[in-house]
Amino acid sequence: CKTDLNFLFSGEKKIQIGLTVDSFVIERWIRDRDVFVATARELGAEVNVQDAGADTKEQISQIDYFIKKHMDVIVIIARDCKALSEAVERAHNAGIRVISYDRMVNDADTDMYISFDNRKVGEIMAQSMMEAIPDGGKIFMIQGSASDNNVDMVKEGFEDTLKNSDLKVVYEANCEGWIAELAADYVEEALEEYPDVKGIMCGNDDIASQVIQILAENQLAGQVIVVGQDGDLAACQRIVEGTQYMTAFKSIEDLARQAAEYAVKMAEEGKLPSDVTDTMSDGSYDIPAKVLEPVAVTRDNIDEVIIDGGFHRRDEVYLNIDYDTE
């Protein structure tokens, strides 16, 4: 019997995971990366992280690079959910498992999808606005990229919930590529026609920052109900300052940790763990899905959820006000 001396000297080969990220411009993806990599390393895996720089062609090249490097699992935070199916097919043909992380890759039959309940995000956004805005109030919707599957799900949840109120959506726009700066132009345009707006639904907290800046320039900051999502530090600061009403908080630590655990298990066992029992459609296929719940964070519960939960420090959240008197 021949002994593999390379194996004896080098030790067991580590699991190799490729993580391709849309862009690190949005604050939350940095936290996703850090928790994912740390968890995978704790489990004995190595992670090759690639930044697509908000470029779909670059992300496709990164997936092909991972295939060439014989990764065991590829995890994709998609730039364009509708443009990666052929790259995923090439990975599958090479025997590599693929996970859609937070954004579903459309029509690709990825091995798993892990995200938050994006429809629920829309629901709690609408519920928060319904609680804070008088009947008949006018609302703007400044959403994320139309190429992001999650945007559609958030919109569905928002609009379906809003049907139970007298609030009126009078203006809609999408920030293509999740370019938050576009929101400033949209809101300026909308305010010209609807200066009496009562609420603005924002695709994420980054977009909300641009919206609130324009509201401030028009002496409306704090008077218009603004909601976003992600629990960014700046958004939490705005909430305690009174210029943003709510952020749909999603525990990035839980999402990234579980995604890393599933990636390692899939590499070790060659199949999906048995505790993933739900499915979601990617447009053509029903994909095994793990869906986490978001939480509406307002001034009333920000200390409990964000600070006590360890997501941001109290001195950071209350940086711009005297929190000792709160």
Report each predicted region and the residues it spans:
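A residue-level marker of the well-folded mature domains of exported/periplasmic proteins
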Residues: 1-326
